[in-house]
Amino acid sequence: MTVPFKIPISDLDYCLEQLLDHKPPKILPPETIQQLCHTLKTELLQTPNIISLQSPISVVGDIHGQYHDLLEIFQIGGSPPQTNYLFLGDYVDRGYYSVETISLLLVLKLRYPERVFLIRGNHESRTITTNYGFYTEVLNKYQGSADVWTFITDLFDYLPLGATIDGKIFACHGGLSPSCQQLDQIRAVDRFREIPHDGIMADLVWSDPDVAISDFKLSPRGAGYLFGNDVIDKFCQDNNLVQMIRAHQLCNEGYTSYWKGKCLTVWSAPNYCYRCGNKASVLEILHSNYDSKDPTNGSDGEISSINGEFIGVNTSFESFGDDDDDYNDYRNRFNNSSRLHKQQGVLPGQFFNVFEASKENDEDTLQGKSVNGINFDDELSTSDDTSGSGGNNNKGDFFAAFFQERPKRQQVEYFL
Protein backbone atom coordinates (compact mmCIF):
# COMPACT_ATOMS: atom_id res chain seq x y z
CA MET A 1 0.00 0.00 0.00
CA THR A 2 1.26 3.45 -0.86
CA VAL A 3 1.47 5.64 2.22
CA PRO A 4 -0.85 8.61 1.63
CA PHE A 5 -0.04 12.13 2.62
CA LYS A 6 -1.43 13.35 5.91
CA ILE A 7 -4.82 14.96 5.35
CA PRO A 8 -4.62 18.67 6.26
CA ILE A 9 -6.62 19.77 9.29
CA SER A 10 -8.43 22.31 7.14
CA ASP A 11 -9.72 19.50 4.92
CA LEU A 12 -10.88 17.49 7.92
CA ASP A 13 -12.65 20.56 9.31
CA TYR A 14 -14.36 21.03 5.96
CA CYS A 15 -15.64 17.45 6.19
CA LEU A 16 -16.95 18.19 9.68
CA GLU A 17 -18.66 21.29 8.36
CA GLN A 18 -20.44 19.30 5.66
CA LEU A 19 -21.66 16.77 8.20
CA LEU A 20 -22.62 19.20 10.96
CA ASP A 21 -23.87 22.33 9.23
CA HIS A 22 -26.71 20.84 7.20
CA LYS A 23 -29.98 19.16 8.04
CA PRO A 24 -30.07 16.43 6.97
CA PRO A 25 -26.27 16.12 7.04
CA LYS A 26 -24.53 16.09 3.68
CA ILE A 27 -22.97 12.82 2.71
CA LEU A 28 -19.29 13.01 1.81
CA PRO A 29 -18.26 12.25 -1.79
CA PRO A 30 -16.95 8.72 -2.46
CA GLU A 31 -13.46 9.96 -3.25
CA THR A 32 -13.33 11.78 0.10
CA ILE A 33 -14.37 8.67 2.02
CA GLN A 34 -11.84 6.64 0.06
CA GLN A 35 -9.06 9.02 1.11
CA LEU A 36 -10.21 9.02 4.74
CA CYS A 37 -10.24 5.22 4.84
CA HIS A 38 -6.92 4.91 3.03
CA THR A 39 -5.21 7.30 5.43
CA LEU A 40 -6.69 5.73 8.54
CA LYS A 41 -5.84 2.19 7.41
CA THR A 42 -2.21 3.20 7.11
CA GLU A 43 -2.23 4.60 10.63
CA LEU A 44 -4.04 1.57 12.06
CA LEU A 45 -1.44 -0.76 10.60
CA GLN A 46 0.82 0.38 13.43
CA THR A 47 -1.89 0.01 16.09
CA PRO A 48 -1.87 -3.11 18.31
CA ASN A 49 -4.90 -5.36 18.72
CA ILE A 50 -5.39 -4.01 22.24
CA ILE A 51 -4.84 -0.28 22.64
CA SER A 52 -3.64 1.09 25.99
CA LEU A 53 -5.64 4.11 27.17
CA GLN A 54 -5.71 6.26 30.29
CA SER A 55 -8.51 7.86 32.26
CA PRO A 56 -10.31 10.20 32.20
CA ILE A 57 -12.21 8.78 29.25
CA SER A 58 -15.82 8.29 28.14
CA VAL A 59 -16.88 4.89 26.83
CA VAL A 60 -19.61 4.67 24.17
CA GLY A 61 -21.53 1.52 23.25
CA ASP A 62 -23.53 0.63 20.14
CA ILE A 63 -24.65 3.55 17.95
CA HIS A 64 -26.09 1.71 14.92
CA GLY A 65 -26.39 4.59 12.52
CA GLN A 66 -28.33 6.86 14.90
CA TYR A 67 -26.39 9.94 13.82
CA HIS A 68 -28.36 12.57 15.73
CA ASP A 69 -28.09 10.55 18.92
CA LEU A 70 -24.32 10.46 18.39
CA LEU A 71 -24.38 14.26 18.30
CA GLU A 72 -26.41 14.13 21.51
CA ILE A 73 -23.60 12.12 23.11
CA PHE A 74 -21.10 14.87 22.29
CA GLN A 75 -23.54 17.51 23.48
CA ILE A 76 -24.01 15.80 26.85
CA GLY A 77 -20.54 14.42 27.47
CA GLY A 78 -18.38 17.07 25.85
CA SER A 79 -16.80 17.17 22.42
CA PRO A 80 -13.28 16.17 21.39
CA PRO A 81 -10.63 17.29 22.10
CA GLN A 82 -11.94 18.35 25.53
CA THR A 83 -13.25 14.83 26.15
CA ASN A 84 -11.54 11.54 25.36
CA TYR A 85 -13.75 8.87 23.78
CA LEU A 86 -13.53 5.12 23.36
CA PHE A 87 -16.18 3.71 21.00
CA LEU A 88 -16.91 0.00 21.39
CA GLY A 89 -18.10 -0.78 17.86
CA ASP A 90 -21.38 -1.34 15.99
CA TYR A 91 -21.35 2.04 14.29
CA VAL A 92 -23.55 1.05 11.35
CA ASP A 93 -26.68 -0.96 10.41
CA ARG A 94 -30.32 -0.56 11.43
CA GLY A 95 -30.24 3.23 11.91
CA TYR A 96 -31.12 5.65 9.11
CA TYR A 97 -27.76 7.43 9.01
CA SER A 98 -25.04 4.78 9.06
CA VAL A 99 -23.11 6.53 6.28
CA GLU A 100 -23.08 9.84 8.14
CA THR A 101 -22.31 8.20 11.48
CA ILE A 102 -19.25 6.28 10.35
CA SER A 103 -18.10 9.23 8.23
CA LEU A 104 -18.16 11.52 11.26
CA LEU A 105 -16.29 9.03 13.41
CA LEU A 106 -13.61 8.51 10.77
CA VAL A 107 -13.07 12.26 10.42
CA LEU A 108 -12.92 12.69 14.20
CA LYS A 109 -10.41 9.86 14.54
CA LEU A 110 -8.13 11.52 12.00
CA ARG A 111 -8.74 15.02 13.39
CA TYR A 112 -8.15 14.05 17.04
CA PRO A 113 -6.11 10.82 16.88
CA GLU A 114 -5.12 10.94 20.57
CA ARG A 115 -8.63 11.73 21.78
CA VAL A 116 -10.92 9.45 19.76
CA PHE A 117 -10.49 5.66 19.69
CA LEU A 118 -12.50 3.12 17.71
CA ILE A 119 -12.57 -0.65 18.18
CA ARG A 120 -14.40 -3.32 16.23
CA GLY A 121 -17.87 -4.74 16.86
CA ASN A 122 -19.70 -7.63 15.23
CA HIS A 123 -21.39 -5.25 12.77
CA GLU A 124 -18.01 -4.09 11.44
CA SER A 125 -18.27 -6.95 8.99
CA ARG A 126 -19.04 -7.41 5.31
CA THR A 127 -21.43 -10.27 5.99
CA ILE A 128 -23.44 -8.50 8.68
CA THR A 129 -23.62 -5.11 6.92
CA THR A 130 -24.87 -6.80 3.75
CA ASN A 131 -27.89 -8.11 5.65
CA TYR A 132 -28.69 -5.43 8.24
CA GLY A 133 -28.95 -2.19 6.34
CA PHE A 134 -25.60 -0.51 5.72
CA TYR A 135 -25.02 -2.00 2.26
CA THR A 136 -28.52 -1.06 1.12
CA GLU A 137 -28.19 2.42 2.58
CA VAL A 138 -24.98 3.01 0.63
CA LEU A 139 -26.66 1.91 -2.60
CA ASN A 140 -29.57 4.26 -1.92
CA LYS A 141 -27.42 7.27 -1.08
CA TYR A 142 -24.78 6.83 -3.80
CA GLN A 143 -26.96 6.14 -6.85
CA GLY A 144 -26.54 2.38 -6.78
CA SER A 145 -22.77 2.33 -6.26
CA ALA A 146 -21.34 0.08 -3.53
CA ASP A 147 -17.89 1.72 -3.61
CA VAL A 148 -18.34 3.54 -0.28
CA TRP A 149 -19.45 0.30 1.37
CA THR A 150 -16.30 -1.38 0.03
CA PHE A 151 -14.00 1.41 1.27
CA ILE A 152 -15.50 1.38 4.76
CA THR A 153 -15.80 -2.38 5.24
CA ASP A 154 -12.18 -2.75 4.10
CA LEU A 155 -11.27 -0.27 6.83
CA PHE A 156 -13.18 -2.32 9.41
CA ASP A 157 -10.56 -5.07 9.04
CA TYR A 158 -7.98 -2.69 10.54
CA LEU A 159 -9.84 -1.69 13.70
CA PRO A 160 -8.38 -2.89 17.03
CA LEU A 161 -10.19 -5.62 18.94
CA GLY A 162 -10.07 -4.16 22.43
CA ALA A 163 -8.58 -1.65 24.84
CA THR A 164 -7.24 -1.43 28.37
CA ILE A 165 -7.88 1.60 30.56
CA ASP A 166 -5.24 2.42 33.16
CA GLY A 167 -4.06 -1.17 32.79
CA LYS A 168 -6.93 -2.26 35.07
CA ILE A 169 -10.02 -2.33 32.85
CA PHE A 170 -10.49 -4.38 29.69
CA ALA A 171 -12.93 -3.14 27.06
CA CYS A 172 -14.19 -4.94 23.98
CA HIS A 173 -17.43 -5.11 22.04
CA GLY A 174 -18.83 -8.49 23.09
CA GLY A 175 -17.12 -10.69 25.63
CA LEU A 176 -14.74 -13.47 26.54
CA SER A 177 -13.64 -16.62 24.75
CA PRO A 178 -12.91 -20.17 25.97
CA SER A 179 -9.93 -20.06 23.59
CA CYS A 180 -8.38 -17.10 25.39
CA GLN A 181 -7.14 -16.79 28.95
CA GLN A 182 -4.49 -14.09 28.49
CA LEU A 183 -4.53 -10.66 26.89
CA ASP A 184 -1.37 -11.64 25.06
CA GLN A 185 -3.40 -14.22 23.14
CA ILE A 186 -5.60 -11.41 21.84
CA ARG A 187 -2.53 -9.37 20.99
CA ALA A 188 -1.27 -12.27 18.85
CA VAL A 189 -4.44 -12.59 16.72
CA ASP A 190 -4.27 -11.69 13.01
CA ARG A 191 -7.08 -9.14 12.98
CA PHE A 192 -6.62 -7.76 9.46
CA ARG A 193 -9.43 -9.80 7.92
CA GLU A 194 -13.16 -10.42 7.94
CA ILE A 195 -14.48 -11.58 11.31
CA PRO A 196 -14.42 -15.41 11.30
CA HIS A 197 -17.32 -17.54 12.52
CA ASP A 198 -15.46 -18.84 15.56
CA GLY A 199 -12.26 -18.41 17.55
CA ILE A 200 -10.94 -15.59 19.72
CA MET A 201 -11.70 -12.80 17.27
CA ALA A 202 -15.31 -13.91 16.79
CA ASP A 203 -15.90 -14.40 20.51
CA LEU A 204 -14.60 -10.92 21.37
CA VAL A 205 -17.34 -9.33 19.27
CA TRP A 206 -20.17 -11.85 19.78
CA SER A 207 -20.09 -13.18 23.37
CA ASP A 208 -22.39 -12.09 26.23
CA PRO A 209 -22.35 -12.33 30.05
CA ASP A 210 -24.96 -14.53 31.74
CA VAL A 211 -25.59 -14.36 35.49
CA ALA A 212 -27.33 -17.76 35.42
CA ILE A 213 -24.15 -19.69 34.61
CA SER A 214 -20.62 -19.88 36.00
CA ASP A 215 -18.65 -21.23 33.02
CA PHE A 216 -19.00 -20.98 29.23
CA LYS A 217 -22.08 -21.98 27.27
CA LEU A 218 -22.84 -21.82 23.55
CA SER A 219 -24.61 -18.58 22.66
CA PRO A 220 -28.14 -18.64 21.24
CA ARG A 221 -26.92 -15.99 18.77
CA GLY A 222 -25.21 -18.75 16.79
CA ALA A 223 -21.79 -17.16 17.30
CA GLY A 224 -19.73 -16.52 20.41
CA TYR A 225 -20.46 -17.79 23.92
CA LEU A 226 -22.29 -16.95 27.09
CA PHE A 227 -19.86 -16.59 30.00
CA GLY A 228 -20.42 -16.63 33.73
CA ASN A 229 -18.96 -15.32 36.97
CA ASP A 230 -16.17 -17.88 37.31
CA VAL A 231 -14.96 -17.07 33.80
CA ILE A 232 -14.66 -13.33 34.33
CA ASP A 233 -13.17 -13.79 37.81
CA LYS A 234 -10.39 -15.96 36.42
CA PHE A 235 -9.80 -13.72 33.40
CA CYS A 236 -9.47 -10.64 35.61
CA GLN A 237 -7.23 -12.44 38.09
CA ASP A 238 -4.94 -13.88 35.41
CA ASN A 239 -4.54 -10.49 33.71
CA ASN A 240 -4.43 -8.23 36.80
CA LEU A 241 -7.71 -6.57 35.84
CA VAL A 242 -10.56 -5.33 38.00
CA GLN A 243 -13.32 -4.91 35.43
CA MET A 244 -14.55 -5.60 31.91
CA ILE A 245 -16.60 -3.08 29.91
CA ARG A 246 -18.50 -4.10 26.81
CA ALA A 247 -21.51 -3.21 24.62
CA HIS A 248 -23.44 -5.49 22.22
CA GLN A 249 -26.69 -5.92 24.20
CA LEU A 250 -29.72 -3.64 24.34
CA CYS A 251 -30.30 -2.30 27.87
CA ASN A 252 -33.64 -0.66 28.62
CA GLU A 253 -32.03 1.71 31.14
CA GLY A 254 -28.95 2.34 28.98
CA TYR A 255 -26.59 0.09 30.91
CA THR A 256 -26.42 -3.12 32.92
CA SER A 257 -24.07 -4.05 35.77
CA TYR A 258 -23.14 -7.70 36.36
CA TRP A 259 -21.47 -9.24 39.39
CA LYS A 260 -21.24 -6.03 41.43
CA GLY A 261 -19.78 -4.06 38.57
CA LYS A 262 -17.11 -6.54 37.50
CA CYS A 263 -18.74 -6.49 34.06
CA LEU A 264 -20.63 -3.51 32.62
CA THR A 265 -22.69 -3.27 29.45
CA VAL A 266 -22.92 0.19 27.88
CA TRP A 267 -25.67 0.83 25.33
CA SER A 268 -25.63 4.17 23.49
CA ALA A 269 -28.49 3.96 20.96
CA PRO A 270 -31.68 5.38 22.55
CA ASN A 271 -35.05 4.29 21.19
CA TYR A 272 -33.21 1.55 19.33
CA CYS A 273 -34.49 0.87 15.83
CA TYR A 274 -36.79 3.88 16.39
CA ARG A 275 -39.30 1.76 18.29
CA CYS A 276 -37.76 0.16 21.42
CA GLY A 277 -38.23 3.19 23.68
CA ASN A 278 -35.06 2.42 25.65
CA LYS A 279 -32.70 4.90 27.27
CA ALA A 280 -29.01 5.06 26.36
CA SER A 281 -25.84 5.86 28.26
CA VAL A 282 -22.19 6.83 28.09
CA LEU A 283 -19.85 5.62 30.82
CA GLU A 284 -17.43 8.25 32.11
CA ILE A 285 -14.34 6.90 33.85
CA LEU A 286 -12.81 9.67 35.92
CA HIS A 287 -10.04 7.60 37.46
CA SER A 288 -9.15 4.08 38.56
CA ASN A 289 -7.39 4.77 41.85
CA TYR A 290 -8.50 1.59 43.58
CA ASP A 291 -6.99 0.68 46.93
CA SER A 292 -7.99 -2.97 46.97
CA LYS A 293 -7.10 -5.67 44.46
CA ASP A 294 -10.81 -6.37 43.92
CA PRO A 295 -12.61 -3.04 44.43
CA THR A 296 -15.93 -4.61 43.42
CA ASN A 297 -16.04 -6.14 46.92
CA GLY A 298 -16.61 -2.72 48.45
CA SER A 299 -17.17 0.96 47.72
CA ASP A 300 -14.41 3.54 48.09
CA GLY A 301 -16.73 6.47 47.43
CA GLU A 302 -19.84 7.02 49.54
CA ILE A 303 -22.88 8.74 48.10
CA SER A 304 -25.42 10.45 50.30
CA SER A 305 -28.93 10.87 48.93
CA ILE A 306 -32.50 11.33 50.11
CA ASN A 307 -35.28 10.15 47.79
CA GLY A 308 -32.88 10.17 44.89
CA GLU A 309 -31.82 13.80 45.42
CA PHE A 310 -28.07 14.33 45.45
CA ILE A 311 -26.67 15.55 48.77
CA GLY A 312 -22.94 14.97 48.52
CA VAL A 313 -20.34 12.52 47.35
CA ASN A 314 -17.21 11.51 49.19
CA THR A 315 -14.85 10.96 46.28
CA SER A 316 -11.34 12.36 46.41
CA PHE A 317 -10.12 14.56 43.59
CA GLU A 318 -7.05 15.79 45.45
CA SER A 319 -4.76 13.37 43.64
CA PHE A 320 -5.42 15.35 40.48
CA GLY A 321 -3.83 18.77 40.48
CA ASP A 322 -5.75 21.87 39.44
CA ASP A 323 -3.38 22.21 36.52
CA ASP A 324 -4.42 18.82 35.12
CA ASP A 325 -6.30 20.13 32.08
CA ASP A 326 -7.27 16.66 30.86
CA TYR A 327 -9.10 15.99 34.10
CA ASN A 328 -10.72 19.37 34.81
CA ASP A 329 -13.57 19.00 32.32
CA TYR A 330 -14.60 15.68 33.82
CA ARG A 331 -14.22 16.91 37.40
CA ASN A 332 -16.28 20.04 36.78
CA ARG A 333 -19.13 18.13 35.19
CA PHE A 334 -19.06 15.66 38.08
CA ASN A 335 -19.09 18.33 40.78
CA ASN A 336 -21.82 20.33 39.04
CA SER A 337 -24.14 17.35 38.70
CA SER A 338 -27.44 17.71 40.53
CA ARG A 339 -29.06 14.31 40.00
CA LEU A 340 -26.87 11.43 41.16
CA HIS A 341 -28.29 8.14 42.37
CA LYS A 342 -26.64 5.42 44.42
CA GLN A 343 -25.62 2.14 42.83
CA GLN A 344 -24.52 -0.76 44.99
CA GLY A 345 -21.15 -2.49 44.85
CA VAL A 346 -19.57 -0.82 41.85
CA LEU A 347 -16.28 0.93 41.20
CA PRO A 348 -15.54 4.48 42.36
CA GLY A 349 -14.66 7.12 39.83
CA GLN A 350 -17.23 5.95 37.29
CA PHE A 351 -20.67 7.23 36.38
CA PHE A 352 -23.12 6.96 33.54
CA ASN A 353 -24.70 9.79 31.60
CA VAL A 354 -28.11 8.34 30.81
CA PHE A 355 -30.10 10.05 28.07
CA GLU A 356 -33.13 9.63 25.87
CA ALA A 357 -33.52 9.90 22.11
CA SER A 358 -32.83 13.20 20.35
CA LYS A 359 -35.74 15.14 18.88
CA GLU A 360 -34.40 14.25 15.42
CA ASN A 361 -34.74 10.59 16.35
CA ASP A 362 -38.36 11.27 17.30
CA GLU A 363 -38.97 13.12 14.04
CA ASP A 364 -37.58 10.25 11.97
CA THR A 365 -39.79 7.83 13.89
CA LEU A 366 -42.91 9.91 13.22
CA GLN A 367 -42.02 10.11 9.53
CA GLY A 368 -41.84 6.32 9.39
CA LYS A 369 -38.49 6.23 7.63
CA SER A 370 -36.74 2.95 6.99
CA VAL A 371 -33.28 2.03 5.75
CA ASN A 372 -34.74 0.89 2.46
CA GLY A 373 -37.09 3.86 2.15
CA ILE A 374 -34.80 6.87 2.48
CA ASN A 375 -35.92 10.16 0.99
CA PHE A 376 -33.20 10.43 -1.65
CA ASP A 377 -33.87 14.09 -2.47
CA ASP A 378 -33.34 15.11 1.14
CA GLU A 379 -30.27 12.95 1.63
CA LEU A 380 -28.51 14.12 -1.51
CA SER A 381 -29.55 17.76 -1.38
CA THR A 382 -26.78 20.26 -2.04
CA SER A 383 -28.88 23.37 -1.41
CA ASP A 384 -27.59 25.97 1.02
CA ASP A 385 -28.78 25.59 4.61
CA THR A 386 -28.62 28.56 6.91
CA SER A 387 -29.88 26.76 10.00
CA GLY A 388 -26.40 25.60 10.99
CA SER A 389 -23.27 27.52 11.91
CA GLY A 390 -21.86 27.79 8.42
CA GLY A 391 -20.53 31.24 9.16
CA ASN A 392 -18.25 29.95 11.89
CA ASN A 393 -14.69 30.96 11.10
CA ASN A 394 -13.06 29.10 13.98
CA LYS A 395 -11.26 26.60 11.76
CA GLY A 396 -8.80 25.82 14.52
CA ASP A 397 -11.37 23.67 16.31
CA PHE A 398 -14.55 23.51 14.26
CA PHE A 399 -16.02 20.51 16.04
CA ALA A 400 -15.77 21.96 19.55
CA ALA A 401 -17.08 25.32 18.34
CA PHE A 402 -20.14 23.63 16.86
CA PHE A 403 -21.20 22.24 20.23
CA GLN A 404 -20.45 25.45 22.11
CA GLU A 405 -23.22 27.10 20.12
CA ARG A 406 -25.83 24.45 20.97
CA PRO A 407 -27.99 24.67 24.12
CA LYS A 408 -27.09 22.22 26.86
CA ARG A 409 -29.54 19.30 27.03
CA GLN A 410 -30.66 17.85 30.34
CA GLN A 411 -29.24 14.47 31.22
CA VAL A 412 -29.73 12.04 34.07
CA GLU A 413 -26.59 10.78 35.77
CA TYR A 414 -26.20 7.59 37.75
CA PHE A 415 -23.10 7.36 39.90
CA LEU A 416 -21.17 4.12 39.96
Curated annotation (Swiss-Prot):
> What CDD domains does the annotation carry?
MPP_PP2A_PP4_PP6
- The active site of this protein is located at H123 (proton donor)
Name the reported effect of D90L: Abolishes catalytic activity
Q: What EC designation does it have?
A: 3.1.3.16
Phenotype when inactivated? Leads to defect in morphogenesis and reduced virulence.
SMART domains, A to Z? PP2Ac (SM00156)
Question: What's a single GO CC term here?
Answer: mitochondrial outer membrane
Residues recorded as binding Mn(2+) 1, renumbered to this chain, are D62, H64, D90
Know the name of this protein? Answer: Serine/threonine-protein phosphatase PP2A-like PPG1
Q: Which organism is it from?
A: Candida albicans (strain SC5314 / ATCC MYA-2876) (Yeast)
